[in-house]
Amino acid sequence: MSRGLFELRKDAITGWWVAVVVDREFNPRRFNRAAKHIGQTPDDCPNCDLAAGGDHVQVRTLKQDAFIVAGTEKEAREAAPGGREPGLGMVGDNGSYQTIVAPRGHHESLAETSPQIAFDMLAQARDVLTNARNAEKTDYLQIVQNFGTNAGALTDHLCFDFYDLPQIPHRIGEELGGAARFVIREGECPWCRMVREEVAEPARLVYEDAASVCFAPYASRSPFELWVVPRHHAADFGTASDAQLVSAADTLQSVLRLLASLALPKSAA
């Protein structure tokens, strides 16, 4: 009996369903596109100008108060000048858009940079999280690293973008609620169970060391989606120790190098 074209898989945490193609072999040529670069040099790169005279990772603020919660079209129209006062239900300017910038001249990928730079960038990410929480002006902070214009990068410089948002994204809220329900139902942390099960049945296992495990999730939402999950049970990246960040940086670089060995595009991380 045919298995069908798609396999409907259920995310064990959120309960969401994903359609996964199962009737064809993987064809790397469909994804084998070289990462495109802008062609910047240290002399015409704005991030290199920012890092001039320094050999350390820095944080650059691109826009304070970057977000306005407009709500529905009706709510946005009512909150416009001449309409309802923002204090009656609309949220004013808040949040931020910032970037963690590697030192001048660092136009390599995260996989290719030095272990020290990788650690320093993760340490800055940890500090950004801690500072945002202490300021009590954020609900969620998302950190993103793009490489190549294919992935939306606007610079060749090695950097992390981060967005300080005034609300929790829907999927994150579903993961938080789903994890709580999982603990009540199963009596253990869902990510701790994933670590144990993916190592025991390594069909989707990509990399593991003493501190972390990397695997392709069962109900993956996109090609090459990978999860790096620490073995240490903790919920707050902002409390990670330097030793844990050294290990996390090594894991990320190792996984990215494995992806590069597939001769696939170095377009996103």
Labelled PLM ranges:
Residues 1-269:
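HIT superfamily nucleotide-processing domains
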